[in-house]
Amino acid sequence: MIFGISDDDLWFPNPYLGDEDGLLAVGGDLSVERLLLAYSNGIFPWYSFRDSDMCHWYCPLSRFVIFPDEIHVSHSMRTLMNKGVYDVTFNEDFHGVIRNCSQLRIDEKGAWLGPDMIEAYTRLHELGCAVSVEVWEKDSEAQGCARHLVGGLYGVVIGAVFIGESMFSLVPSASKLALIHLAQTMRVNGGRMIDCQLETPHLKSMGGRHIPYEEYMKIMRRASDRHDAPRPVQQEGRE
């Protein structure tokens, strides 16, 4: 069953009542309050802004996640990391990351990262509830500290859980590098889980696996109920 919700109603139906693809509700706004309520319950927005002016809310009952302790770093990625070709930072260029994520998807069928979504996640970022990871390529021919943004990812933070929203790579393996640094930083800072939302071969090869919604919510509640819950990522600066 798919429910309709209005901008004035700050609620979501029981996730177990959604359809087999996880679609739970249609409608509602992208306010900070609604987004945080959604993410705290494993619900996320996803819709084609060119095909519909109504937000679609999903909550799959099988969740694809990566636990920071289980991140798989391949031999080729270790070699790349040891070369020191790239710098990885947190929250240095949230706008650049989300802009690149949206640009890579602008021509895709069902593109979802439109102006309304960008504005909504920017508001979350300004409140410290959305963070970015940037991968910079150093310019060896330039003097000083010249570098270029070549990859990254961003997502929402709920307590010690990171919900990944999108990633991009302008050079091979840049998004993998961002994800590895995210997981390693979460492990040090007490982060519990990375919600990948959707399974891809790329994420599965890096340690992603499915867990049931019940287990997901147990982790989410433990990670968000604590008043002293550690931040899963650094708020700014280099890793």
Give the positions of each predicted feature.
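N-acyltransferase acceptor-side catalytic subdomain
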Residues: 1-239
